[in-house]
From Swiss-Prot:
The keyword tRNA processing does not apply. InterPro entries: CCR4/nocturin_mRNA_transcr, Endo/exonu/phosph_ase_sf, Endo/exonuclease/phosphatase, Leu-rich_rpt, Leu-rich_rpt_4, Leu-rich_rpt_typical-subtyp, LRR_dom_sf. Residues 30-82, 134-153 are annotated as: Disordered. Mg(2+) binds at residue 360. It is found in: Cytoplasm; Nucleus. The keyword Isomerase does not apply. CDD domains: Deadenylase_CCR4. It comes from the Eukaryota. It comes from Emericella nidulans (strain FGSC A4 / ATCC 38163 / CBS 112.46 / NRRL 194 / M139). This is CCR4-Not complex 3'-5'-exoribonuclease subunit Ccr4. It catalyses: Exonucleolytic cleavage of poly(A) to 5'-AMP.
Amino acid sequence: MYSQTHQQQHVIMNGGQAHQRFGMQMKFQTQNHHPHPAQQPHHHAHHNQPPQHVGHQHNFSSGALASATPHFTPSHIQNGTHTNIDEELDESMNEHWQQQLQLAAESRQASSPHYYARAVAQQTKGIQIAPSQPEAQENGVNQKNGITKTKPASRQGWHALDFGGQGLRALAPSLFKYAFLEKLYLSHNKLKVLPPQIGQLRKLTHLDLSANDLTELPEEIGMLTNLRHLLLFDNNIRTLPYEMGYLYRLEILGIEGNPLEDVLKSLIMKEGTKALIRYLKEEMPVHVPPPARDWLVLDETAATSPDKVSVLSYNTLCDSSATQSHYGYAPSRVLSWEFRRETILNELRAHDPDIICLQEIDQGSYNEFFREQLAYSDYKGVFWPRGRAMGMQEEDAKGVDGCATFFKGSKFILLDKQVINFGQTAVRRPDAKGQDDIYNRLWQKDHIAVIVFLENRQTGSRFIIVNAHLYWDPAFKDVKLIQTAILMEEITKHSEKYAKWPPCTDKAAFRFREAQGEQTMPEPAPSAEYASGDQIPLFMCGDFNSSPGSAAYNLIANGGLIEEHPDLEKRMYGNLSKVGMTHPFKLKSAYGAIGELSFTNYTPDFKDILDYIWYSSNTVHVSGLLGEVDKDYLQRVPGFPNYHFPSDHIALLAEFSVKGKKGKVVEADFGPQRN
């Protein structure tokens, strides 16, 4: 907001021209709003969307302006000219175009320098503002009335800039470093070009470029997915970039006073902003695909290793979750399951890993598509749906998602398979009695993990493959932590059982026949033996919905967590909360070797690392990784899914080599020997 003197200035634009910075807090808004057509409701995005910052919002055509400007009629324009708006209204008599004309008239009224900043200053005049000087401090904390208070964290106090009416011909690059901006007024200037760096201001909700000399908009305008108002009145714009179809929250597109091509103008006149944005989104051509993700070689000697394995993990975004309400920026074709499943299948075949772990695959898609299609590429599969499928009619159960694990049938023998239902496992624990949080918070979540126990046909090495999907909601950190603890506890139990698993005695029955005929295979090695469960190579893949540094992440990486961890919020989960949580495995994230990826989940409102391939570092080491998505490509793509990335998550792929000798050293028995 304004400083108390309203005189703060920065020099960042147009060769040193000064400007005032301002923002307006909601408590300073008056309620005598100028009459305005009702706004369309905000679009509700995906469940990962963070809370919107509404504490500094104001409407361009109401609020401060209602009390700061004289009343005017739409037919009166400040420059002294008159337009017969009534005649134009008679032609359409449409609320959408009537709103366009009203807002255009208001925009033309606002041509004086810093019009909007001055309006806010006028409105807030006389309002008492709390002193900005901090209270006396002692050792970094505030002391008042004998009460010690933690020093509040600093925050950005202003979120809007008004450069209106300054005669600007260019914008300095430093402007686009103000990524916190929510409102930017650049109206009534002489701008001929809007730099593509505008896409960096992704928090903008209001952008006013009216009364300039613009002839086009950059593709990067589509990155501003939080925009509610985009005002382009009185420019020379003839067409709009298809990337504006990404602006699914846009409520007002001010386009009157531009020589816009007929098809676009007709659409916005008759059906309004939402219809035009939807048209641009659906008609958006398929862009040039990004460069292939680099393959990062971490150990060149592994190329000749006789015992290596590649593992892929991928949350594919279940069909029932891929809706316009969650992914309003994506064209309907992009969200269609028929398109996405083919794109996913092609990606899996292109990578051709030894092991595939998929999350959010529904039962119907597994049985009727992926299992059959991947069988042509030598894969066998194991699938379990989430717990809600139990008791459902068969047809209804087809739509329930779960975890699917595929492995190369010519390379591995399936020794065992298990499912872990976190909620059901928790309530069966002896210490669950009387623990209400287990029933009220954990048991209701039906997320699962699937375990498969494999043996390499040729080398005899054995592997435990875990495919997990944890609960998503950040408000349930305790649930994610307990799900992780139960996961590690169950893996520990199964690994000890697998350490005693008998060897395969007749591998001849598993000889692999190539399509073109019988292939001569080397004699298979005997099954490896392991002294304990933590000596068996372990890969734990999935969507853990937990960022690096979270409690769930630290439990896996560090082997344990203290009792009564803060993330539990003093909730009671039996011994897991009373005693603490431990596991015996020495696990590392495969991508930890390069400091993790920039993200594994990418949407306009959420970009973070949620997916991992964990491995037991005492048994295998990482030799290669699939790298980042091209950063230049991401400058014009606000979120996934899109035509090239069929899920809001990206695939992870890592290659490993088994370390040294495996398990027990079995001495050969040559029978009685002569001295």
